[in-house]
Amino acid sequence: MAQTFLGQKRLRKYYGKIREVLEMPNLIEVQKSSYDLFLNSGDAPQPLDGEGIMGVFQSVFPIKDFNETSVLEFVKYELEKPKYDVEECMQRDMTYSAPLKVTLRLIVFDVDEDTGAKSVKDIKEQDVFMGDMPLMTPNGTFIVNGTERVIVSQMHRSPGVFFDHDKGKTHSSGKLLFACRIIPYRGSWLDFEFDAKDIVFARIDRRRKLPVTTLLYALGLDQEGIMDAYFKTVSYRLEKKRGWVTPFFPERVRGTRPTYDLIDAASGEVIAEAGKKVTPRAVKKLIEEGSVTDLLVPFDHIVGKFAAKDIINEETGAIYVEAGDELTLEYDKDGDLIGGTVKELIDNGVTNIPVLDIDNINVGPYIRNTMAQDKNMNRETALMDIYRVMRPGEPPTVEAASALFDTLFFDSERYDLSAVGRVKMNMRLDLDAADTQRTLRREDIIACIKALVELRDGKGDIDDIDHLGNRRVRSVGELMENQYRVGLLRMERAIKERMSSVEIDTVMPQDLINAKPAAAAVREFFGSSQLSQFMDQTNPLSEVTHKRRLSALGPGGLTRERAGFEVRDVHPTHYGRMCPIETPEGPNIGLINSLATFARVNKYGFIETPYRVVKGGQVTDEVHYMSATEEMRHTVAQANATLDENGKFVNELVNTRQAGDYTLAPMESVDLIDVSPKQLVSVAASLIPFLENDDANRALMGSNMQRQAVPLLRAEAPLVGTGIEEKVAIDSGAAIQAKRAGIIDQIDAQRIVIRATEDLELGDAGVDIYRMRKFQRSNQNTCINQRPLVKVGQQVSKGEVIADGPSTDMGELALGKNVVVAFMPWNGYNYEDSILISERIARDDVFTSIHIEEFEVAARDTKLGPEEITRDIPNVGEEALRNLDEAGIVYIGAEVQPGDILVGKITPKGESPMTPEEKLLRAIFGEKASDVRDTSLRVKPGDYGTVVEVRVFNRHGVDKDERALQIEREEVERLARDRDDELAILDRNIYARLKSLILGKTAVKGPKGIKPGSEITEELLETLTRGQWWMLALEGEQDAQIVEALNEQYELQKRALDARFEDKVEKVRRGDDLPPGVMKMVKVFIAVKRKLQPGDKMAGRHGNKGVISKVVPMEDMPFLADGTPVDFCLNPLGVPSRMNVGQILETHMGWAARGLGLNVDEALQEYRRSGDLTPVRDAMKHAYGEDVYAEGISGMDEDTLVEAAGNVTRGVPIATPVFDGAKEADVNDALTRAGFDTSGQSVLFDGRTGEQFARPVTVGIKYLLKLHHLVDDKIHARSTGPYSLVTQQPLGGKAQFGGQRFGEMEVWALEAYGAAYTLQEMLTVKSDDVAGRTKVYESIVKGEDNFEAGIPESFNVLVKEVRGLGLNMELLDAEVEE
């Protein structure tokens, strides 16, 4: 691969051994493709039938009015251009969305009174505005009211049919009761279940159960039809009073002991004697010979069988037996036959009786028994029964019942299986219905019951509902589609009513439609759905992970309380689809998961993972994506199976997975092999080096804590990485990539201007301007700041990283810092995972981060008059106003502390009635400062920092103050600068093309002084201004046309640029849309640098976390033999019990990387002294090894090599991919090459005494993160603050400026000490004794020290509660009694 500019800057030594044939897919593909499909925009594939906005409109329209004289049809829809771009929406607290325009057609019919025939009377088409449709930003998020939100994908049970049993829990006998459930995408659920007596019942929507035959009758089957559907028929033929002749099935007698002799009906010989076991050999012989087809069975053997058909007297129509009736014989005392249905049949000459083939072993009589219990016999009564269950209390009629039953399962408006449901149902029941058949059919219901009965008979298996073939993912697009459908259906009702009530001939479609419900549904979904979440923006990794999250919670999903262990557990089908490691600790464990690195979601919503195809033991490079169901049919080998250089398996037996089991299989039988070892974990887990050496619980914490790492002031990529850091940085959108190749034209901290050299289209200026995000606040108050990595004049290729973002370093994810750590105790300061740090870390800002807080204040129009933002605040001294400008708004750059005023604001307060004197004074001196109170925005306790940005928003038509005008001027200047740059590059490009077109051609005429027919040369052009070049008319017709076209293009682009500029300026100058009642709004952003200090939480990448206990002077820290003091001391006891040995390997590997870097550094110093490059080349070869050197480094020229070497002097970065990284031997080898001992331990000296420690200590380089749990955000103390309204007790929590609860146990402690006065104080004046509180304040002010406690307010609350129960309770004073 061609080394990009950045790759040359810093090479990573790669330890992976397995060649990857497939590049990791884009990490936020899930979000983007799903929403593209919904909007049917971009280059997304065509959606399936009825998907996306189009599908929603098609399913709701056409809308007919109640008497069908008019129809409203949907023609097409179109999304217009969004009014504001992403940036503007974030600044103005708006939603990033595009107006949705729908073309509707209203058709009015004329109905002939007599014939009822319809003829079209009128057709009207019109574009109707249907509200705004939120758009997704390029990074897969949504901007809603100015904040970035993510819609998390939901895992839910796939529609289709599921078979299950109750695990023997329902009935005391422990008998398994089987059940079957048909789950549609939307519509009524249909359940079938057995009870303990083996009767089959059906339930609709979990209501009262009905015998299943009632449902079958309602479907239009009769008794014979039902028997036919579920049982085979055998005939019993009477043989001259000797017995019955019936077909013989040899299989059924295998291993049984017959109760009677089995006699061949044809020959009369006994083929098996009664009471003797029939051996399998005998059965086999009978099957092979095949001579015995019928048996002769005893006469009374027919008793207890059931008739398969109605047997009727053809002439009289009398029914002897009905289908399903039991056949009986009755004998008297002497054993003579006196009655029974069989006698009646024989007497009437029926000697061939069709009987249900039920043997109670292979086939049970469940459906027949159910039918016998069912009191319904026909469709009408069955329908009425169903109606009574569904609509209890309403009088049933046959018509209503029939209509209800039809709409339940067979009406596409009310019931939708969805394409997925239909596919799953066809697969499970072996049906062949078309994918477009989205409702149930009669055959489906019959097949479900049949499969359920077969399960009860012991055929087939129940389904595993946690199998990923039975759970699917609903992504943004689909969730949004469901929500929009709900909105449109609400709208449909209103439209229908309006169509009936208005004069239909005169209205247009616009008059019928009120788009509010649809717009409201969308707004509600994005604003308050459980799945629409505030984006976790702490660092780029947390963004990516949030977008790849899969939640089982949410509407239509599980709830935390109801979810059992099975749902949360890791399932074999998760392999390569969902990460087994990354999930939250706590109540949501296992319910919220992360998509695996290579996984993707297919069109049906099932998660697929890629495999390479294996043919005859030979691994090919062909890659197939498989869903969990497809994978069950294959044998899959692990990615680390040993292959030879041609890709053939080395071992005869290979470790494989087959249908969820792990087996050793011969290499010929292997069909697939994993694409990569990291395909089974998520992005966060695959960022942990040596993950394979960590315990899973700690790996889980490691993955979760990386997401909480705060972006530091200077990012530093890990020395020991895994090789996917670059992928995360780019896909998260933190680093900026070049959209197309070009040359860097100009650059400053705010933007990069690139002159494109490729992908130029006609009418394209060929300029790309990339704006950096400078010190913006993220959702989590961390700082987003981008800085350029390229230089002017440099050539960049498409997709190259041109700017770093937060937590990225040279295009790689960099969440923390590489620091020197020693695993050793130090005076007990690392007890219980505490961390001891050197003062250097705090002094050199190693772990310093910037945090930005946003404060806003709004001036409203109140009943008493408008609030005003001003510098003129009553009773506030000049000192407090020192940071405000004349408009009353704080300066940028002001240092502020708690209590400082940021924005001065006054609010009018109710006028007290004026005395005559005041009236007189006011009449003389004019308007006195009417009563106002100070409601300024002040800095909250615990916040301090520097003001970095101020934004002022004004309502339309409100005069702008000086500050707002100044901000506006700056913004317009910035836009003008952009326009001028684009224009300059456009000029340069166009004139260069013009010059190449006209040089050497002949001019027919031109401006003054040009002779017709003269040749155009460089000299001639220099005598003219560039604008005059266009006046040169060329000789050739074609040439003249080309120049003309170029000129037109130039003018067109200039006009487009100007128009775009004017539009933006207009947006800046126009007033803002503020909430009702708000006249003006000011936002102030304060940034603060937070250094590392005791109480801050830090963590490594292996789940090793701790809190800083002490900052030690650098000279007191333990130091190495060369005098280097260590930066961190960690507790060695934190490793063995937690089994995250990966951190130790990382420490050793980092130490080796640093040693090799120091070697390169020495070689560079030698080169600077002598000018000889050989030592540098040798050092690089030594550091990277022969192969990498030959491939990437040997061909570099001097400057490039020196730059590449200069970038690795702090340490040679390495990549050790998960499950395929450096082994122990590699670590030893690296340590040896760096010149260290393979134990990885060094001799340390005590910084305070200078003495050597008793034994060598493990010292190395470790990558540590500072987490978003900073002590500054947690520390808090209450002085006097707000009280709860009812109980009058102080509030709790930092946000409420609350106190610490003095609880029950603390009271016991004071009681135990007998500290009565302290206790009384705690329970009264320091808590909720309102009168006492004020008295104490007074006495303190007066300097007295005695006070009385009164009655606590909570006691009054108790008294009121008791009175509420109707018991009068009063407090009486003891003295008064006397």
UniProtKB/Swiss-Prot annotation:
Q: One Pfam family, short name please? A: RNA_pol_Rpb2_2
Q: Which InterPro entries match?
A: DNA-dir_RNA_pol_bsu_ext_1_sf, DNA-dir_RNA_pol_bsu_external_1, DNA-dir_RNA_pol_su2, DNA-dir_RNAP_su2_dom, DNA-dir_RNAP_su2_hyb_sf, RNA_pol_bsu_bac, RNA_pol_bsu_CS, RNA_pol_bsu_protrusion
Reactions it catalyzes: RNA(n) + a ribonucleoside 5'-triphosphate = RNA(n+1) + diphosphate
- Coiled-coil regions listed: none
* An example molecular function term from Gene Ontology annotations: ribonucleoside binding
For biological process, the GO terms are:
DNA-templated transcription
Stated EC number for the protein is 2.7.7.6
EC class: transferase
**UniProt KW keywords:** DNA-directed RNA polymerase, Nucleotidyltransferase, Transcription, Transferase
Tell me, in a sentence or two, what this protein's role is. DNA-dependent RNA polymerase catalyzes the transcription of DNA into RNA using the four ribonucleoside triphosphates as substrates.
Q: How does it assemble?
A: The RNAP catalytic core consists of 2 alpha, 1 beta, 1 beta' and 1 omega subunit. When a sigma factor is associated with the core the holoenzyme is formed, which can initiate transcription.
Q: What is this protein called?
A: DNA-directed RNA polymerase subunit beta
Record organism: Ruegeria pomeroyi (strain ATCC 700808 / DSM 15171 / DSS-3)
